Amino acid sequence: MQIKEQLRQLKPYQPGKPIEEVKMEYGLEKVVKLASNENPFGCSQAAKDALHQEIEQLALYPDGYSAALRTRLSEHLQVSESSIIFGNGSDELVQIICRSLLNDQANTITAAPTFPQYRHNAVIEGAEVREVPLRSDGAHDLDRMLEAIDGETKIIWVCNPNNPTGTYTSEQELIAFLNRVPEHILVVLDEAYYEYVTAEDYPESIPLLKQYPNVMILRTFSKAYGLAALRVGYGIADEALIRQIEPAREPFNTSRIGQASALAALDDQTFIQECVEKNKAGLKQYYDFAETHGLTCYPSQTNFVLIDFNRPADELFQALLEKGYIVRSGQALGFPTALRITVGTKEQNEEILTILAEIL
């Protein structure tokens, strides 16, 4: 068999060690995972209740149109139902977009470092990936991204807030950027951490869709909504664009349980606000720690923080792992002396920071 040449350039996704495996390997009774930016407070009770109500329907295929969730989400976002596309997590939407727009004659532009699935899926389609280094403040260098555009550019990815730095592009910066991007190029605003943002000058992106039909917004129920296991993401864009890329979407790509739980979670905004407030307090714990120990820390608009410890990240990762804390080493993220740490509960944050202080 002849596998695509570009697949030989890629490695399959390597998930972190399962919690149970870490317990067995290091003889631990408790392991805390602060590596994947999951919600440490779980999900809304309403989402759990909705999940249980769907259990009797598991023999039936889900609604391929996600009609009930689509209607409620369109009301929540104040957009038309036909301007929404659902994905098996927003990861699948990245795949759908690349499959729809890219080929071996095209190129796509991303920041570096940023969410790696943009590059991964573009390479599979045979496209050239043009990576533009982040600015010194960890944010996208939009001017240099504009300079990278040519006649074969099809997609520009703006991860906002950016993963792994947690930094963001302001509304003023974004609008100035969009005004200079040719209309035939799709600009994808990946807002996976949208609900956690507190910056006053963060873009209100949905109203921009009327002026910029070449913009698509990606969001997810995996982060603040705490439904990572159920894989429900969505995209918002001009109705014509959604119609054009819908054929690349699998027919039943979101489950009955996922749709029902996401709908219920959407209606519990009190839970989201509580999580956002706890996250703000948690971020302050990390900021204070970084200041006390003279460490560099990017201000974050997400539920994670990237701290530069000025020593090999893999060594710190291993030291924490042996103590029962799983974080993300910056080695594979483009920051070889930093750790990306998910903001946990107050107690989890205190525990890991105590361990880090001892190591330092």
Curated annotation (Swiss-Prot):
Protein name: Histidinol-phosphate aminotransferase
Organism: Bacillus velezensis (strain DSM 23117 / BGSC 10A6 / LMG 26770 / FZB42)
Biological processes, Gene Ontology terms: L-histidine biosynthetic process
PANTHER family: HISTIDINOL-PHOSPHATE AMINOTRANSFERASE (PTHR43643:SF3), HISTIDINOL-PHOSPHATE AMINOTRANSFERASE 2 (PTHR43643)
Subunit record text: Homodimer.
Keywords assigned by UniProt, alphabetized: Amino-acid biosynthesis, Aminotransferase, Histidine biosynthesis, Pyridoxal phosphate, Transferase
Highest taxon of source: Bacteria
Pathway: Amino-acid biosynthesis; L-histidine biosynthesis; L-histidine from 5-phospho-alpha-D-ribose 1-diphosphate: step 7/9
Family named by the database record: Belongs to the class-II pyridoxal-phosphate-dependent aminotransferase family. Histidinol-phosphate aminotransferase subfamily.
Chemical reaction(s) catalysed: L-histidinol phosphate + 2-oxoglutarate = 3-(imidazol-4-yl)-2-oxopropyl phosphate + L-glutamate
N6-(pyridoxal phosphate)lysine, modified sites: K223
Cofactor(s) the protein requires to work: pyridoxal 5'-phosphate
Name of the coding gene: hisC
EC number(s) per entry: 2.6.1.9
Record lineage: Bacteria, Bacillati, Bacillota, Bacilli, Bacillales
Pfam family, one: Aminotran_1_2
Root EC class: transferase
GO molecular function per UniProt: histidinol-phosphate transaminase activity; pyridoxal phosphate binding
